[in-house]
A protein has these predicted regions:
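Gly/Ser/Thr-rich loop/hinge elements
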Residues: 172-222, 228, 258-262, 276-277, ...
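Mature N-terminal segment immediately following signal peptide/propeptide cleavage
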Residues: 17-48
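Extended, small/polar residue-biased N-terminal targeting/export presequences
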Residues: 38-127, 321-347
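Short acidic catalytic loops
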Residues: 134-135, 158-171, 224
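Low-complexity, Gly/Ser/Thr/Pro-rich intrinsically disordered linker/tail segments
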Residues: 285-347
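C-terminal, low-ordered peptide segments at domain boundaries
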Residues: 7-9, 75-158, 289-307, 311
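A mature extracytoplasmic/lumenal domain signature
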Residues: 89-91, 137-140, 168-170, 197, ...
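Terminal peptide-recognition signature
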Residues: 29, 76, 134, 164, ...
Length: 347
């Protein structure tokens, strides 16, 4: 999120790209990609494709910066099918400071943006039958959201099951999902591994041993997805599914498993280049290009009602010695299944 924000700088007048400027951008792009892109063979294929386009003079007539960035992105993705990879144009001067180390002002603006959106924690409630629902539309750094997540955990602590709605979640920071995941385990658990090609290193990610607020480790967990669910929430769903900790309900996700960071290409161009790859310690692979396959595949619009019914069945199966509660659950399931059969949805 923060790494992709437009850099601060001095605004310049618009100008037409020259042949030299286009060549500078391409040279820097291919150099960074060939050294750091997470899949070396694919990096070579992309570099070859770009050089062939360049040799055929297909970029020569492009003098608009935004169009040049768009064309390069399309040509890269035509080979890689990696939607984390792309080139952006900035009308403002791009500082030559390290782009993965944002300035204090960048950080201030980023945090303020998050505060105005409640750091994307958008909805929390208890559905009929005592099923908790938490909608998260993006992941900010854990240090920003600790109080929000602890408050959400407290709100959900007396529910009998939890549904996480990621249908409109398009990504975010790595430690944001890890904080939320940590509430659903009793002990430290190995969640994922991340291989960094640029450093030739692998980092393990484990749930946190202690989290503020109550644990949700005893709750059945359901995760809602859509075709638009992408990147960080996909990793959350994929890893929890692989560990057998959650059932995924909804649509196959977007398929973006590669972590990215910004690279300065020139005074007005920036590339987002995936440099690492997260894999599950259970499957030893990821969901890049294929998405997370739901346990129960339904249209996104039907996912909440479907998960609600599944959660109630799970609660009913555990209910003993309380005829009144059992009858309540059976009636609620009957009503919701009738709604489902008639084409109704839950919003």
């Amino acid at each position: 999120m923060l790494a992709q924000a437009a850099p601060d700088g001095q605004r310049t007048t618009e100008h037409r790209l020259t042949q030299a400027e286009r060549a500078e951008v391409i040279h820097a792009l291919l150099k960074s990609m060939e050294s750091d892109y997470i899949l070396p063979d694919v990096a070579k294929q992309m570099a070859q494709a770009i050089r062939e386009h360049q040799a055929r003079h297909e970029y020569d007539s492009i003098t608009d910066g935004e169009q040049f960035a768009k064309t390069l992105t399309q040509d890269l993705q035509a080979v890689s099918h990696d939607h984390h990879l792309g080139v952006d144009y900035s009308a403002e001067f791009v500082s030559d400071r390290p782009m993965d180390k944002p300035s204090p002002e960048d950080i201030r603006k980023f945090r303020l943006q998050g505060e105005r959106r409640n750091f994307e924690y958008r909805r929390i409630e208890v559905l009929p039958g005592n099923v908790g629902l938490l909608q998260v539309d993006g992941f900010y750094p854990a240090e920003y959201v600790r109080e929000i997540v602890a408050g959400a955990a407290g709100f959900l602590s007396h529910t009998d099951a939890v549904i996480l709605d990621f249908r409109q979640n398009h990504g975010g920071m790595v430690d944001g999902p890890l904080l939320l995941e940590s509430y659903f385990f009793k002990e430290m658990t190995h969640i994922s591994d991340s291989y960094n090609r640029a450093e030739n290193s692998t980092q393990q990610f484990w749930t946190m041993p202690v989290v503020p607020g109550p644990s949700l480790a005893d709750k059945d967990l359901y995760i809602l997805t859509s075709h638009d669910t992408f990147s960080a929430p996909e990793a959350f769903a994929y890893d929890m599914q692989a560990l057998g900790r959650a059932k995924v309900v909804g649509e196959v996700t977007g398929g973006g498993a590669h972590g990215t960071k910004p690279y300065r290409l020139s005074a007005h161009f920036i590339a987002s280049i995936p440099f690492n790859r997260g894999t599950s310690p259970v499957t030893h692979t990821d969901y890049e290009g294929v998405g997370v396959k739901p346990d129960v595949q339904v249209p996104a619009s039907e996912a909440l009602l479907t998960a609600h019914i599944l959660a109630l069945h799970g609660i009913l199966a555990r209910t003993t010695g309380d005829p009144g509660r059992k009858a309540e659950l059976e009636k609620l399931i009957e009503d919701l299944e009738a709604k489902q059969k008639s084409g109704g949805v839950e919003e």
